[in-house]
């Protein structure tokens, strides 16, 4: 974990916090055991945590695959999480693969490495991926950040999006609507997840039993990386 996370742990200990909401994927739950307070995690399930709030990552993977296939894609790639680390992206990959198998569509899942994940830098691996698989016509990226960098690589290589390659991201963060073309993505209900985490933490602090896992639905937001839009047409949420 990084220095900031150490500082936050020290702050929790010195201030005798009443509860913790954990979003980090790197801090171990054992770090909090000595605090003896309720622990709610977001997008991370811990066997000995108080409760976890997650989005429906499996359904997100399904929606992405179904949309790419419906748009005519037949050679799909999913850019997933870090090979050696359990991540929410693993469930997204599972949903994606499930649909590809059902539809008998050619696909592969490509994992990333800790370096790319930690440095938020995917350009080199994405360029190599496109050069090695020139017939790929649809890519589901496990985050909008990866999808945005993929757009930059496509521009460099002269691959037209969405005419030659269609892209779906995940999260629906601000960058997804700011790229050219804007990114079709799976909307993650972050505000609702945060509000649910706070509610569960308060209930747990009052001594109530809270569910070990709470899953919120995701939705597909169609933008320019998979569909041509007429001028002035709003984003369509399905």
Tell me the role of every PLM-derived stretch.
Residues 18, 73-75, 137:
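Short acidic/polar active-site loop segments enriched in Thr and Asp
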Residues 1-66, 130-131, 135, 238:
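Alpha-helical recognition/docking segments in bacterial nutrient-uptake
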Residues 127-236:
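Flexible loop/turn connectors
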Residues 1-4, 53-63, 79-125, 140-148, ...:
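Hinge/beta->alpha junction and helix N-cap segments in small-molecule ligand-binding domains
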Residues 31-37, 97, 102, 150-159:
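Glycosyltransferases and closely related glycan-assembly transferases
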């Amino acid at each position: 974990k990084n220095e900031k996370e150490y500082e936050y742990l020290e702050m929790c200990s010195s201030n005798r916090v009443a509860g913790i909401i954990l979003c980090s994927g790197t801090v171990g739950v054992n770090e909090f055991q000595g605090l003896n307070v309720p622990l709610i995690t977001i997008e991370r399930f811990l066997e000995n945590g108080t409760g976890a709030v997650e989005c429906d990552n499996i359904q997100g993977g399904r929606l992405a695959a179904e949309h790419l296939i419906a748009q005519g894609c037949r050679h799909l790639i999913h850019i997933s999480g870090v090979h050696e680390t359990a991540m929410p992206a693993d469930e997204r990959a599972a949903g994606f693969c499930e649909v590809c198998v059902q539809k008998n569509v050619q696909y592969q899942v490509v994992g990333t490495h800790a370096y790319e994940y930690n440095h938020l830098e995917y350009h080199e691996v994405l360029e190599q991926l496109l050069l090695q698989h020139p017939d790929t016509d649809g890519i589901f990226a496990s985050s909008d950040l990866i999808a945005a960098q993929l757009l930059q690589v496509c521009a460099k290589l002269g691959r037209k999006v969405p005419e030659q390659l269609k892209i779906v991201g995940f999260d629906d963060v601000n960058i997804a609507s700011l790229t050219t073309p804007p990114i079709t993505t799976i909307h993650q209900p972050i505000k609702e997840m945060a509000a649910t985490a706070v509610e569960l933490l308060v209930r747990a602090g009052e001594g109530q039993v809270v569910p070990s896992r709470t899953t919120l639905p995701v939705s597909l937001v169609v933008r320019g990386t998979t569909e041509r839009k007429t001028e002035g047409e709003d984003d369509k949420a399905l």
